Amino acid sequence: MVTTSENCVRRDTCVQNGKGEVHMKDLTDKAGLYGHGRLFTHIVVDPGCSVGYHYHHPETEFYYILKGEGLFNDNGKEVIVHEGDVCVTGFGEGHSMENQSQEPLEMIALIVME
């Protein structure tokens, strides 16, 4: 199966009460994850914008940083993340991501079910 870029659902939205809007491109729908996940999305966080702090139940979310730099809040511990880093937020844990740089932050988000 191939999903072309033209067939991806795109949306600009405030995510989890974060700052500003985040640009999202769903790489597949929930059905495409065959019951094992609910999100597989390319995300662009513009400078000054963020994904607000939130928790995951009963699921785990992965962020793979494609480009840029972000401030990742990992259960209250803030860590600067860069291209190539992977952030994991497990069941019952909380996180957020903020772009404090002058360049867009690009990442892939994948949520898998426990």
Question: Predicted segment positions?
Answer:
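Short, conserved beta-strand element in jelly-roll/cupin
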Residues: H42-D46, Y55-F72
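A generic "binding-loop/recognition-motif" signal
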Residues: P47-C49, P58, K77, E93, ...
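Short, charged/polar surface micro-motifs in flexible loops or helix N-caps
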Residues: L33-H36, D46-C49, E69, M113-E114
